[in-house]
Regions:
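Membrane-interface helix termini and inter-helical loops of multi-pass transporters
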Residues: 68-69, 126-133, 189, 193, ...
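Membrane-water interface regions at transmembrane-helix termini and the short interhelical loops
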Residues: 39, 64-68, 90-101, 127-128, ...
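Membrane-interfacial loop-to-helix junctions in multi-pass transporters
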Residues: 137-141, 200-213, 239-253, 284-290, ...
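Long, contiguous bundles of hydrophobic transmembrane helices that form the permeation core
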Residues: 2, 7-48, 55, 329-431, ...
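Transmembrane alpha-helix interface/packing and boundary motifs in multi-pass membrane proteins
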Residues: 221-225, 256-265, 297-303, 446, ...
Length: 660
């Protein structure tokens, strides 16, 4: 995995050219920990036929979002019809239940029936809208079947936990409707109408955002990956941090942050980037449990890394009614603190173990990296287009896709061929299935909450429970987000939390932006929080470590993700909200950085040298003090951490003098 000094191209080809057995092992890991990878196997002409359908879907999404401005219900129902069609083509009835070039008769029926239900709505949207609650019996049957087929597809590609949430809410909604009208048919009719035929259900805000923005950016990410930018990111990270103590771990942090931003998948990025970085970390001297944890924590953070954040960020922009560029800017400081926290932890671990960095022979030359800097052009163009606000997000994404294709053709080491273009469009469609289905189910969940008025009930209950103790409200919200996020995709988790918990925080007095960022962050960290820490378990499998210990280490490394949301909740200036002065923002960030350093040192048991339990507790306490708003708490925290630092500095000096 090292770069030859006589051939710097090797540094950019780190992840390419994997032998067939290694690639097979990685694919097996993906299937084990990433539900999206448990797909049917198509070979021969069938593989190309299915791929062609996927390509048509991607091209349809690009074309329709750019040029179609008709009835929203029509385009969203047609979008879900295609999602159902390619979804059943892709996902078998259960994990491992796959035969090559085989699709059972019942899957064909489900695919055709489900697609027909959504197409019926798409072609008859206007008359159905005019009928409103006066829909006929056949409308109810079609809508009910469409919902059931969508639920089955969700079970296959998203998972059961989100369906448990939906099931509980559907039962509650049914009884709620019966309280108004004792007729079972009328209750069912009302539920089907609101959840299938209105924008308070499957074609609600989540699916609208998915169709309008998310799918385009998934396709953009697929093209960007095929330009060779991931290899460039790893090589760049090697050049920037490989030389320092424990360099490979820092390389993992930087490269995973950059690659995770493009891939948008915690597990997927852990497996792909980790196949390079984890062996490097182990070779340097890091314990397997720690190496897997570093990769998992850094890959998970890719979803909060501007400018291309996770799919939930687009939903957040829609829910807050803010431009995506504004959301990305507000995410900068929390993301910096998150990755700085991981960086500090791996540095302290390296110092504690006495690890060295990579040699010059193992790092690429700056001259070669500069030759490949054009690979960043699509990202730079996207940032410029989005931040300028001159064009729509759809236009920005489409132009950036075109730029990625051009850049791919220019990269002679990993040139973008027509086959790769086909594969990128195919991968974009596959990536859209899970997100689209999750958004549709999240729309139904949000619809149930809206129809029943459950949000108001929950808001009043938690506000009364927490009273004036806003901190308790934050803790309750955090627990809800993490527990739900353990089995629910980030997009669906955010939609549910934005409909329930975010309004609670807003009613308690927290700013709108802070409330939504709070639930967004804690929905993401579930991927590294035991017992269901899928990204950590994937990292553990590559490192051949203990899954639970890897998960615990990943949680420790990502401690900033558990603390930073509380900081910006009480000090929203970190999100550029209610900013009184530039100095106020600088002060918040500096105290947060020192606080993260203190907590990381306490958890690692090392600052300038190994420390005992008392010093570790003092560091953690001091770090938390620095994160609590207020000059007094900052002063106390600074004194505590500074005291430990001074004592260890003197101890090191004495030890050096005694040796001399």
């Amino acid at each position: 995995m090292s770069a030859n000094k006589n051939d710097p191209k090797d540094a950019v080809k780190m992840t390419s050219g994997l032998d067939s057995q290694t690639q097979a092992d990685l694919d097996a890991l993906m299937r084990k920990y990433d539900r999206e990878s448990n797909t049917r196997v198509w070979e021969g002409w069938q593989r190309w036929a299915v791929g062609a359908i996927m390509v048509i879907f991607s091209l349809y999404c690009i074309g329709m979002t750019l040029f179609y401005s008709g009835l929203p219900e029509t385009r969203l129902a047609a979008f879900l019809a295609m999602i159902v069609f390619i979804g059943f083509l892709t996902y078998p009835v259960k994990k491992g239940h796959v035969k090559v070039n085989s699709m059972p008769w019942y899957d064909i029926i489900l695919m055709l029936v489900g697609t027909s239900c959504f197409l019926y709505f798409a072609f008859n949207a206007l008359p159905i809208i005019k009928l409103a609650t006066r829909i006929q019996t056949h409308h109810v049957i079609i809508g009910a079947i469409g919902i059931l087929v969508l639920i089955e597809l969700c079970r296959r590609c998203v998972g059961v936990p989100i369906l448990c949430v939906l099931g509980a809410l559907l039962i509650y909604t049914f009884y709620n409707q019966l309280s108004y009208n004792p007729s079972l048919y009328q209750a069912l009719k009302n539920i089907v109408y609101k959840l299938f035929y209105t924008t308070n259900g499957v074609i609600g805000t989540p699916v609208n955002v998915c169709y309008t923005y998310i799918v385009l950016f998934i396709i953009f990410g697929a093209f960007l990956e095929r330009t060779g930018i991931a290899n460039f990111f790893i090589a760049l990270a090697n050049r920037l941090a490989g030389w320092s103590a424990g360099g490979p771990a820092k390389v993992a942090v930087i490269s995973s942050a950059l690659c995770g931003m493009v891939s948008g998948s915690s597990v997927g990025n852990t497996v792909t980037t980790g196949s390079v970085t984890i062996p490097m970390m182990k070779k340097t001297g890091y314990h397997p449990d720690f190496a897997g944890a570093v990769e998992a924590a850094a890959s998970t953070g890719g979803q909060i890394m501007p400018p291309i954040m996770g799919a939930a960020a687009f939903l957040m922009a829609e829910y807050m009614d803010l431009p995506y560029a504004t959301v990305a800017v507000k995410a900068i400081l929390p993301a910096v603190l998150y990755f700085t926290g991981i960086f500090i932890s791996v540095h302290l671990e390296a110092k504690k173990l006495g690890l060295k960095g990579l040699s010059k022979d193992e790092m690429p030359k700056w001259s070669f990296l500069l030759q490949k800097i054009y690979l960043l052009a699509p990202l730079v163009l996207l940032v410029w287009l989005v931040s300028s606000g001159a064009k729509t997000m759809q236009f920005s994404a489409a132009v950036s896709i075109l730029a990625a294709i051009i850049v791919g053709f220019l990269n002679k080491d990993e040139r973008l061929t027509f086959k790769k273009i086909f594969e990128a469009l195919e991968a974009g469609a596959k990536g859209a299935i899970t997100v689209g289905v999750a958004c549709a189910i999240a729309g139904m969940i949000a619809g149930c909450i809206t129809v029943t008025g459950l949000a108001s009930i929950l808001i009043n209950a938690i506000v009364q429970l927490a009273g004036s103790a806003t901190f308790i409200g934050l803790i309750l919200t955090m627990v809800c987000c993490i527990v739900l996020g353990m089995g629910v995709p980030t997009t669906a988790n955010y939609c549910i939390m934005a409909s329930t918990c975010a309004p609670i925080l807003i009613k308690m007095g927290f700013p709108l932006v802070a409330a939504h960022f709070f639930v967004f962050y804690f929905g993401i960290v579930a991927d590294i929080t035991p017992p269901v820490a899928l990204a950590a378990y994937a990292g553990s499998a590559i490192a051949k470590g203990n899954p639970m210990k890897t998960g615990i280490n990943a949680t420790k490394l990502a401690i900033a993700a558990f603390i930073v949301p509380y900081i910006f909740a009480y000090s929203p200036a970190m999100l550029f909200v209610n900013v009184t002065s530039v100095w106020a923002v600088i002060q918040i960030v500096l105290s947060a950085l020192l606080g993260i350093f203190g907590v990381a040192a306490g958890l690692e048991g090392f600052m300038l040298r190994k420390m005992n339990l008392l010093f570790r507790l003092i560091c953690i306490g001091g770090g938390l003090g620095l994160m609590i708003p207020g000059a007094l708490s900052d002063l106390v925290g600074l004194v505590l951490i500074g005291g430990v630092f001074a004592i260890q500095y003197v101890q090191n000096k004495k030890e050096t003098l005694s040796k001399d």
